[in-house]
């Protein structure tokens, strides 16, 4: 197991990190309430660093994101701009996209506790997360066309897959502000809760259930299977079969069966880091996607 890292002792830019606690739950708080938790480039960079560290830390079982105060995140801080633009179109990389990919590539389950308004990258950064729980009072907007730009943070990939092309096009085309309970957002949130103050406690309940009762490897590979988007049931069947063959031989599979028969909670130990180290079903190769991934 990797040495436990003290996340809270580091001077992150406008981020507060709580945990991981005894169950392995870490909370990343966007702590810039005086600016509606608008993101700066140092905040984006720090979140990517945090995700990398937590992904490699065996003591972290689940990561929860939330916002300080009444907002979840009002998007990029426009007073600071969008960061350095690449020298050419081919070399420029969207900062929000870098964060989205860091979340996507993190093996640990991620949960967004959307306690208030989420706009622009404030909502698109949550799309790669495993679960989104929002306050019914939260307002949501994808305002890119109102700023003469296009969707960011790989949201043109995620949003249609989460809510369908029709709803995604409506949200992107209008750029308007909608209630979290709007029918246009149907399917985006796993749950909506009555108040902003209930959002984080509910997210922590879900996180604790995941941390205590599920296999890290099984959860990560299942998510990868879903996003791989097999083109036919036959393709899905072949890939699932290959992964199942490997998992049937794992200690966690044996523990899962044994704990069920003994009517107790499982004590899973396998990690994705260990699986990759053994050369079994590498992510980005035979698990998720093509033999060679696009060069970024």
UniProtKB/Swiss-Prot annotation:
Catalytic activity: a (3S)-3-hydroxyacyl-CoA = a (2E)-enoyl-CoA + H2O; a 4-saturated-(3S)-3-hydroxyacyl-CoA = a (3E)-enoyl-CoA + H2O
Pathway involvement of the protein, from the record: Mycotoxin biosynthesis
Keywords: Lyase, Peroxisome, Virulence
InterPro entries, A to Z: ClpP/crotonase-like_dom_sf (IPR029045), ECH/Chromodomain_protein (IPR051053), Enoyl-CoA_hydra/iso (IPR001753)
Gene Ontology terms: cellular component: peroxisome
A Pfam family it matches: ECH_1
Main location as per UniProt: other
GO molecular function, one term: enoyl-CoA hydratase activity
Subcellular compartments: Peroxisome
Enzyme Commission number(s): 4.2.1.17
Leading EC class: lyase
Residue spans crossing the bilayer: none
Residue interval(s) of motif Peroxisomal targeting signal type 1: 294-296
Function: Enoyl-CoA hydratase; part of the gene clusters that mediate the biosynthesis of the host-selective toxins (HSTs) AK-toxins responsible for Japanese pear black spot disease by the Japanese pear pathotype. AK-toxins are esters of 9,10-epoxy 8-hydroxy 9-methyldecatrienoic acid (EDA). On cellular level, AK-toxins affect plasma membrane of susceptible cells and cause a sudden increase in loss of K(+) after a few minutes of toxin treatment.
Other information: Gene clusters encoding host-selective toxins (HSTs) are localized on conditionally dispensable chromosomes (CDCs), also called supernumerary chromosomes, where they are present in multiple copies. The CDCs are not essential for saprophytic growth but controls host-selective pathogenicity.
Family per record: Belongs to the enoyl-CoA hydratase/isomerase family.
Name the record gives this protein: Enoyl-CoA hydratase AKT3-2
Species this chain originates from: Alternaria alternata (Alternaria rot fungus)
Gene that this sequence comes from: AKT3-2
């Amino acid at each position: 197991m990797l040495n436990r890292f003290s996340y809270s002792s580091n001077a992150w830019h406008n981020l507060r990190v709580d945990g991981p606690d005894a169950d392995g739950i870490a909370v990343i708080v966007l702590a810039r309430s005086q600016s509606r938790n608008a993101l700066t480039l140092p905040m984006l960079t720090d979140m990517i660093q945090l995700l990398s560290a937590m992904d490699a830390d065996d003591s972290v079982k689940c990561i929860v994101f939330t916002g300080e105060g009444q907002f979840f995140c009002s998007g990029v801080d426009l007073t600071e701009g969008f960061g350095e633009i690449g020298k050419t179109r081919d070399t420029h990389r969207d900062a929000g996209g870098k964060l989205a990919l860091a979340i996507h590539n993190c093996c640990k389950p991620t949960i967004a506790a959307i306690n208030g308004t989420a706009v622009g990258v404030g909502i698109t950064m949550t799309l790669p997360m495993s679960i989104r729980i929002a306050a019914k009072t939260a307002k949501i907007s994808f305002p890119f066309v109102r700023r003469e730009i296009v969707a960011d943070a790989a949201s043109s990939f995620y949003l249609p897959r989460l809510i369908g092309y029709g709803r995604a096009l409506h949200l992107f085309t209008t750029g308007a502000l909608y209630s979290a309970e709007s029918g246009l957002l149907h399917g985006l949130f796993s749950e909506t809760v009555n108040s902003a103050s209930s959002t984080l406690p509910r997210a922590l309940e879900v996180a604790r259930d995941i941390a205590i009762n599920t296999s890290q490897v099984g959860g990560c590979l299942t998510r990868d299977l879903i996003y791989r988007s097999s083109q036919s049931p036959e393709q899905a069947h072949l890939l699932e079969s290959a992964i199942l063959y490997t998992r049937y031989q794992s200690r966690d599979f044996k523990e899962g069966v044994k704990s069920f028969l003994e009517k107790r909670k499982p004590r899973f130990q396998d990690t994705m880091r260990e699986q990759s180290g053994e050369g079994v079903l590498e992510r980005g190769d035979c698990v998720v996607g093509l033999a060679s991934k696009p060069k970024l």
